[in-house]
Amino acid sequence: VTAALGTLALLLATLAALGGAAALLRGQVAGRPALVALGERAPAAVFAFVTTAVAALEAALLRPDFSVAYVADNVSSGTPLLFRAIALWGALEGSILLWAWLHAGFTALVAWRYRGRYPATVPLALAVLLGIGAFFLLLMLGPADPFAPAVPVPADGRGLNPLLRNHPLMAVHPPFLYLGYVGLAVPYAFAMAALLSRTLRDEWAAVTRRWTMAAWAFLTTGIVLGAWWSYEVLGWGGYWAWDPVENAALLPWLAVTAFLHSAIVQERRRLLRLWNCALVILAFLLTLFGTFLTRSGILASVHAFTVSLIGPLFLLFIAAVLAFSLAVLLLRRDQVRDEGALPAYLSRETLFLLNNVLLLVLVATVFLGTVFPLVVEAVA
């Protein structure tokens, strides 16, 4: 019954996300406020349905119900209660569910926070957020099903990965990282919506500043907690051991740090418009890249899950997001032209840009160093 409830909730959440995005887009393009109003209710429905799915999986983990394959693979009758609860994000399917839940929460907060405000922009931003959420929900209706049945049903489960039950930081480190990752979808969605609607040309950066700062703070906390944890486990080598997944967490942090500095220049001087849009797109794409590395299993890492079928799907999604973002920039290239030029050398704005360049050099260095083994393997 628990598994059936969870699966039904995920199906309804997917339908609500896809239907809401379609209603928002259709209503905005056709000028039909009733459709837009209907679509703006979708984020709350999606969050409610995904919350139901999370509650169903948590109930199965706490019981524990070994008829659910995820439960049988990640807890046992001897697993302490705390680690049964946090096993929700201890493996592939549960981590995707956590991501979808947090994303649904952010989307619902955006819908609530900006209800009735920026009517030309917010519906499009919500449509982008719902579309992103729909991808993760569809994964769970396919290759990453957290409610798949265990066949045959074992008498006891395998228990959580020993590396994950050695420290209580398992309870907070992954959620903070995920909050940082998911939070970066908000400035990305607003940047795309501002370009498409030709509104909030410079204001979108200010409107999303708190969301960006929150995502940066969550990501920073997650990285610091992970660094602390890495020194508690023999064989992990501490932080930073050039682990691909550690690199993948650092990449969006560097990109969003650069954006937080350069956004000030856009807000005050109406400069770096294209640069800031590119930084937001890059930061969001890097969160997807990090998720791909962790969940595809293509690189050896103490953090990575086993090889799964969702790796190619993530690559396709990353390619789709990149293509969509570039198309929007090309379509609205007049919107990202600067008004004037940067002031003289050694001005505050020029120093901010230099800071950005240094951070992006770090991004390029870490990224190339991370994917280099894949390139060598492909060539070989």
Sequence positions of predicted segments:
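Polytopic transmembrane helical bundles with strong interfacial aromatic enrichment
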Residues: 1-380
